[in-house]
Amino acid sequence: LIRRWGDKLRERRTIEQDLRQAIQEGELHLVYQPQAKIHTGEVTGFEALVRWKHPIRGDVPPGLFIPIAEESSLILAVGEWVLREACREAATWTRPLTIAVNVSARQLIDTGLAELIQSILAETQLSPERLEIEVTETALISDPSRALETLNRLKVLGVTIAMDDFGTGYSSLSNVREFPLDKIKIDRSFIKAVHANKQAAAIVRAVRLLCDGLGLPVIAEGVETPDELHFLRKEGFTDAQGYLLGAPVPASEIARLVFNNVILLPSTRVRIVSEAAAQ
């Protein structure tokens, strides 16, 4: 057991050292998962997701290296790189789509985050209203007062704030009331359970009604099956994200999603045509 623990510790240290070098050597890259209108398939924006291609290990799973980065100061360097690269690439798109970037708890309580984002927006010439910062409930409650201060400063810049993984943290309703949020993202764990668990379905319905009452847009995360999409459409959801609507793609492939001056996902085009033919 001790030997196994020692092996894991050495592996963690190796990954941390390699990640530090990866930032400097340009081994990180971004992929973008579309967020789309459920009824039309029109893409409204993309979420930036960081990937790491190690020269020896190959593709390192985000679930492996991101937690290690979050446990060290490396998440600040990784986070800054992601913000700058996402804004730089989004500024080159031919349509003014939203770009969503996740911010960790460590970044959120960093007193310099708002200034960093302001500097990056000026550097990349990306309009502030196109940048959406995603924060989790866990990040918000790690240091509520500093998180609130940072979010208020971002709001002054014109940046949109979204609560990610809604329902998985603590005191969700109080967080919605106390923090300056512009959007709610329902966690995948609720979406995948809507048909097998009546409670999950009830929670998803309740969140939509809550957001409607507060005037907050809501987006369903992790939609992977036609049944899940059908449920969301039936319940009045308008926006979703997930592999059924589109897998993450590199920046070079975003242009191919443009179709007759309206951005439609390839899988959605087929569905829309099929539904139209059936009517």
Question: What kind of region is each of these model predictions?
Answer:
Residues 1, 67-69, 189, 193:
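A short, mixed-charge helix-start or loop-turn motif at secondary-structure junctions
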Residues 67, 117-120, 149-152, 178-180, ...:
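Glycine-rich, phosphate-binding/catalytic loops in enzymes
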Residues 38, 55, 104-111, 130-145, ...:
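EAL-family c-di-GMP phosphodiesterase catalytic domain
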